[in-house]
Design a protein with these regions (language model features):
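Rhodanese-like catalytic fold shared by cysteine-dependent sulfurtransferases
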Residues: 1-59, 67-109, 117-159
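Short, surface-exposed ligand- or partner-binding patches at beta-edge/loop junctions that are enriched
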Residues: 112
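Active-site flanking residues adjacent to catalytic metal/cofactor-binding acidic residues
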Residues: 62
Length: 159
């Protein structure tokens, strides 16, 4: 298997196996693009128009971008600002560090990053916690703003 590609145990193809690492019990690696694709396979990713409609029906937008990025790009009015490094702790309805909006596993969380890559990984992680309706915004904040949906300058209020 030296230098050959293989399929990892979860069925994801394209995993790079170098120097017979998998055969020897070593690490099997995937590219970040493969990780994002695997995450997205389990998500129902709304475009900005559909996300807006879902928000009017009770879905919650969660902006995970760092403060500096939100300062440059702006933010979505009404979105909860929860930086990525604490997201799972804030949204786990069984956790002691949850926010008040994290009432149960059935909340429709729509995670937003800048362009919709980091948010896909974050939404997949939320689903692993049992937040089965969690997803992310296809195209991220950039697509939201390009669609002419509401944005504003930053209000530094982190949760």
């Amino acid at each position: 298997m030296d230098g050959a590609a293989a399929t990892v145990a979860d069925g994801t193809d394209g995993a790079a196996v170098t120097d017979g690492a998998a055969a020897a019990g070593g690490p099997v690696t995937r590219t970040v693009d493969q990780l994002v694709a695997a995450a997205r396979a389990g998500l129902d990713r709304p475009d900005p128009a559909r996300a807006w409609a879902e928000v009017t029906d009770g879905a919650r937008l969660v902006d995970i971008r760092p403060a500096a990025q939100r300062a440059r790009e702006g933010e979505i009015p009404g979105a909860l600002v929860i930086e990525r490094n604490v997201l799972e702790w804030r949204l786990d309805p069984t956790g002691s560090h949850r926010i008040p909006e994290a009432v149960d596993h059935g909340v429709r969380w729509i995670v937003v990053c800048s362009e919709g890559y980091a948010s896909s990984l974050a939404a997949a992680s939320l689903q692993e916690l049992g937040l089965y309706r969690a997803t992310d915004l296809d195209g991220g904040f950039v697509a939201w703003a390009a669609a002419g949906l509401p944005t504003r300058s930053v209000d530094q209020g982190l949760r």
